[in-house]
């Protein structure tokens, strides 16, 4: 009797088990991180849009539950180590700037190779997405070489130049120590300045102690990292809004996720990508006003100064494209597509670069 009852209960349990996947009974934990802190717009959107939206939609539309373990501002990975953090599985999802991967992702700074592009982050991320969609290598390289999947592009706000000294023409910058990150250091080099590689978390102390006297930076960085305290001058030179950050997920972790959870992550990531454009664009004028209110001298230089700087860089895009082409990368194709996409969107270059 007891044996019969036991067999019956085991049979029922087996039926229930077969009907209910093990994964449906598990909580999915994902570690998400960035070396930058939440005062950065894209990290703020990771924390306050991507994470809660994925959590909510998975709970509402599936039998699963997602819990995120969050680590920003270098708590889990540093700014220059995030690609490797995702690659190794130390974290599952990472947001980072390709500027810190000049060897691993040299072509992904392609908008930087065409300075004085659109100052609209909305337009920038749309242009970048159009190019990524036409050149599969740009997305596939993450999976093929770095064991991660690119799920969103991230736009920055428009880059300008903040300094602790006043300047009015490009020649005023000659010999000045100015900071940047990755390939945008070339903008400084061609202008005659002394470029210094740096990152936002160290910017305040570096300017305070005279390591350098200015930064290629968008206004949110000048506001949120209080750089106005050590750099009184913020000059709108209009280098362009650059899309050269990304959000990636470890490939092995991705493969283990249920299909419906994958679909929701991609859905939210697409919205997140668009928001990096719209939120940055909405905040730009507010941040300039905030800087003025804090005593910063905010000026917009005449178009002829912008054109002079562009002329100093006239041959660089073609040179850089040839250099990367020689490494087997589709650089000339990517730069040509970017120029065309920007012009189709209505952008007028101060100098029309020739890359072929």
What does each model-identified segment do?
Residues 1-5:
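Positively charged n-region of N-terminal signal peptides that target proteins for export
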Residues 8-18:
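Bacterial N-terminal signal peptides
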Residues 18-24:
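Sec/Tat signal peptide C-region and signal peptidase I cleavage site
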Residues 25-125, 140-356:
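N-terminal secretory/targeting leader peptides
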Residues 125-139:
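Signature of the catalytic double-stranded beta-helix
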């Amino acid at each position: 009797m007891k044996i019969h009852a036991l067999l019956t209960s085991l049979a029922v349990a087996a039926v229930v088990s077969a009907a209910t996947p093990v994964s449906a009974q598990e909580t999915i934990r994902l570690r998400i991180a960035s070396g930058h802190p939440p005062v950065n717009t894209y990290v703020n959107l990771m924390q306050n849009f991507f994470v809660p939206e994925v959590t909510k939609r998975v709970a509402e539309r599936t039998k699963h539950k997602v819990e995120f373990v969050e680590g920003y501002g270098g708590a889990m990975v540093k700014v220059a180590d995030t690609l490797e953090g995702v690659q190794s599985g130390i974290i599952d999802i990472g947001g980072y700037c390709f500027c810190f991967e000049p060897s691993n992702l040299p072509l992904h700074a392609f908008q930087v190779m065409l300075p004085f592009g659109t100052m609209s982050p909305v337009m920038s991320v749309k242009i970048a997405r159009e190019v990524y969609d036409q050149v599969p290598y740009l997305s596939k390289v993450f999976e093929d070489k770095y064991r991660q999947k690119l799920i969103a592009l991230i736009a920055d706000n428009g880059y300008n130049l903040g300094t602790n000294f006043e300047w009015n023409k490009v020649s005023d910058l000659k010999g000045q120590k100015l900071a940047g990150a990755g390939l945008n250091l070339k903008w400084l080099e061609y202008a005659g300045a002394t470029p210094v590689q740096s990152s936002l978390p160290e910017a305040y102390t570096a300017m305070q102690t005279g390591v350098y006297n200015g930064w290629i930076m968008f206004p949110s960085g000048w506001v949120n990292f209080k750089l106005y305290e050590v750099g009184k001058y913020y000059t709108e030179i209009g280098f362009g809004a650059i899309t050269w950050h990304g959000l990636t997920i470890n490939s092995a972790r991705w493969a283990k996720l249920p299909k419906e959870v994958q679909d929701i992550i991609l859905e939210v990531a697409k919205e997140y990508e668009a928001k990096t454009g719209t939120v940055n664009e909405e905040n730009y004028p507010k941040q300039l006003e905030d800087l003025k209110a804090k005593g910063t001298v905010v000026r917009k230089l005449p178009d002829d100064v912008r054109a002079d700087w562009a002329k100093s860089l006239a041959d660089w895009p073609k040179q850089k494209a040839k250099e990367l082409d020689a490494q087997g990368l589709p650089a000339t194709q990517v730069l040509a597509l970017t120029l065309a996409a920007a012009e189709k969107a209505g952008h007028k270059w101060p100098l029309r670069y020739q890359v072929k």
